[in-house]
Structures are given as C-alpha cells and as structure tokens.
C-alpha cells in the first residue's frame, strides 16, 4: 500500500475573535497562500448592543452616557459630538468658559487615545516597554477625568448646554504641570521606536493607502491624513473655540503604517499646544447655558428653594423637548470623523440617532490593505487602524 503526500498551500485561517491582537472581538477569516494573505474578511457584530435603538427610548440627557461606551478609549470626544448636535437643534449658545473646558478635555482625550493606540500597536509588533511606560502617563490623565466628573472613564461630563460642573480648585495648575513634563515622555517614546531598525522594518511600506483610496473608502482622521490629505474638522469646520487656537495639522506622504505612527506622535505634541493655550486663555464665567429649560439649577440653589428642587427633578425625569428638526454634527475624534445624525420630532426623546463611527469605515479597508502581505503584517495593520469595537458594532 502506497501513501501519497500532498503539500497544501492554500488554506483558510480564523483570526480571532479571542486573539490578543484583535483589539476586542474581531473575527477575521483569512484566505492564505502559504504565509501570504490573499483575502481578509472581517466578521463584525459580536459587540452589538443596539445603542442607536436604545437611545430612542431615553430622554436627550439620559442618552448621553451611551456615547461614553461606544469608543471607550476616547470618551469625551463622543459626548462632545452628541452635545453639539442637541445644541444645534435647540439653537443654544454655550458660554465661552464651557467651550474652553470642552476643548481642553477633548485634547486630553486625544492624548489618552493615542498613548493607548501607539503602545498597544508596539506591543502587538513585539515592543513591550512603551506600553508599560505610557500607562503611567495615562494614569495621570485619567485622574484629571476623575477630578472633574468622579469617573475615570465614563465621565458624562460634556452635556448639552455646557459641562456638568466647573473645574475644581488646583486642577488647572496640575494640568499645566503635566504639560511641562509630558513632552519629554513623548521624546522617550520616540527614542524607543522612531529610529528603531526592527520597528521600521515592520511598519515601513506596510498597509499602504493612497490618497484616492482613502477618500473612496471614507477614511478620516489619521488614516486619511497619513495618505497626504490635509483634512481635520478642527480646521475645516471649527466648533467651539478651535478657530481661536493655534495648532498644526500633521500630514503623511507615503500612507503606510510608519507615517500613521509619526502623525499620532506629532498629534500628541499639538494637543499639548492646544491644552496650554486653553489654560492661558480660559475666561471666568458660567459653565452652563443660561436657559432654565435646558440646564438644571445649581446645588446651592436647590438646598434653599423648593421650586429649584422640583425644577431639577423635572429635568432629570421628564427631560427637555427639542423642536422638530434634524442635524448632522461631526467632531474630529482621535480616531477620525465621529458624526451624529440626530432627528427630533418635537418630543423629549430623539426620534432617530444615527452614529457615524470612523472605525467602521477603516475596518472595511482591511481587505485591500492586507492583500499580498504576510500574516504577521495583518496584526500591524489592525494596530495602525486603531480599531475599537464598541464604536464599530455599536
């Protein structure tokens, strides 16, 4: 009896959904030719929680915490988008101090996001040290979150009409101290990675995206700017006080993983510039809109007046009504253009809330980005896309 040996080169590989480099619950079905990827098919929906439908059963204020839990790495940026959408429907003007506080914390959020994105990406590729060093800095930023909202992550701090409460005493001083030492932490991160021979071998010319491909696939944020397209909503369509602040928009040339890494590093430096300007320019004044149908009375007034207590109770149970209309409002979140399409029918609950998550578009491009690359490069490409499945699956 003769045995015949056959060499199999073409096979299908299941990557995830419990793979440590999958950044959550990603399941990839990879068609392989030896070690080379011929096709990558993402299977999404494993973290679907029906957020958009749940929002329809909540008041406008009760819907806000859902946005913290979409991309759970850049929380306040999403609160910001939703709050701006509600304010646009209400034609509400936010006090200048509240606008500066919002921008301050959105840039803190950007640094939080990029620190995690860069260092987990490095860990996927094989560099462990940056991850441990960066988490020390993230801890300081999460402490700032905790001091303004009481929560380290899901803050619900940016609200329609302003912010939940004013900055506590000493916080601005501590944020200023952080900005003075953080630039040298970025330098340390760059010393480990930017010129590292192995890091460059794993990232240069991997996952290349041309400017036209980025536009065709609906990429935004770092994924778009890495391909040489200078598009940043903070510049192109400024919101709050971004038009009064001075910062640069870093743009790549080759559109590969290394360019996107360099852009995220530079964006952290630009966020530091914005934070310092916010601290220096922040005026005194109110932190909520002077609209009693939208913003609750202060705690001290509630303790003195029964009417104020009733007013507070009404706002948090019944909520406020929004005129029948619709709006699409987008912000430059750390991962790209995060948009909210909000439809009101004149009641105290949203009729429809469609969420435009940047990671959803980026994940669809994984197939063409990883085609004819090695299996190990797929991990690099997922890392450079900075995917979080809370916002992809919603």
From Swiss-Prot:
It is found in: Mitochondrion. One of its GO terms (biological process) is mitochondrial electron transport, NADH to ubiquinone. Transmembrane segments: none annotated. Its EC number is 7.1.1.2. It is an enzyme of class 7 (translocase). The keyword Zinc does not apply. Complex I is composed of at least 49 different subunits. This is a component of the iron-sulfur (IP) fragment of the enzyme. Belongs to the complex I 49 kDa subunit family. PANTHER family: NADH DEHYDROGENASE [UBIQUINONE] IRON-SULFUR PROTEIN 2, MITOCHONDRIAL, NADH-UBIQUINONE OXIDOREDUCTASE 49 KDA SUBUNIT. A stretch of 270 kb of the mitochondrial genome is duplicated within the centromere of chromosome 2 resulting in the duplication of the gene. The expression of the duplicated gene (At2g07709) is not demonstrated. It is also probably not RNA edited and therefore differs in all the positions known to be edited. HAMAP family: NDH1_NuoD. This is NADH dehydrogenase [ubiquinone] iron-sulfur protein 2. It comes from Arabidopsis thaliana. The gene is NAD7.
């Amino acid at each position: 009896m003769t045995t015949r040996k056959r060499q199999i080169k073409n096979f299908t590989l299941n990557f995830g959904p419990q793979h440590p480099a999958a950044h959550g619950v990603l399941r990839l079905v990879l068609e392989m030719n030896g070690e080379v990827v011929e096709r990558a098919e993402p299977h999404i929906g494993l973290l679907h929680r029906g957020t958009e439908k749940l929002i329809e059963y909540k008041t406008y204020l009760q819907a806000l915490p859902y946005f913290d839990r979409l991309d759970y790495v850049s929380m306040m940026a999403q609160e910001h988008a939703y709050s701006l959408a509600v304010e646009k429907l209400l034609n509400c003007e936010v006090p200048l101090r509240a606008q500066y506080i919002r921008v301050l914390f959105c840039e803190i959020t950007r640094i939080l996001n990029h620190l995690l994105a860069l260092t987990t990406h490095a860990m996927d590729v094989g560099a462990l040290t940056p991850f441990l060093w960066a988490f020390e800095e993230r801890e300081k930023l999460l402490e700032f979150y905790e001091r303004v909202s009481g929560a380290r992550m899901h803050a619900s701090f940016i609200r329609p009409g302003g912010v939940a409460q004013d900055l506590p005493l000493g916080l601005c001083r501590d944020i200023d101290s952080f900005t003075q030492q953080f630039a040298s932490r970025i330098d340390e991160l760059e010393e480990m990675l930017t010129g590292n021979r192995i890091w460059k071998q794993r990232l240069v010319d991997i996952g290349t995206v041309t400017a036209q491909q980025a536009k065709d696939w609906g990429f935004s944020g770092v994924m778009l700017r890495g391909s040489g397209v200078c598009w940043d909503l903070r510049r192109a369509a400024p919101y709050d006080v971004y038009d009064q602040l001075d910062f640069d928009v870093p743009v790549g040339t080759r559109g590969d993983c290394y360019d996107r890494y360099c852009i995220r590093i530079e964006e952290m430096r630009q966020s530091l510039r914005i934070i310092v300007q916010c601290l220096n320019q922040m005026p005194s004044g109110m932190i909520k809109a002077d609209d009693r149908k939208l913003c609750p009375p202060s705690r001290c007034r509630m303790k003195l007046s029964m009417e104020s207590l009733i007013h507070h109770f009404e706002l948090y149970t019944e909520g406020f009504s929004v005129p029948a209309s619709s709006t699409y409002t987008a912000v430059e979140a750390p991962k790209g253009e995060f948009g909210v399409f909000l439809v009101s029918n004149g009641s105290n609950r949203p009729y429809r809330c469609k969420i435009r998550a940047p990671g959803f578009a980026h994940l669809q491009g994984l197939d063409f980005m990883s085609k004819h690359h090695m299996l190990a490069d797929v991990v690099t490409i997922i890392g450079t896309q900075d995917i979080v499945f809370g916002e992809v699956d919603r």
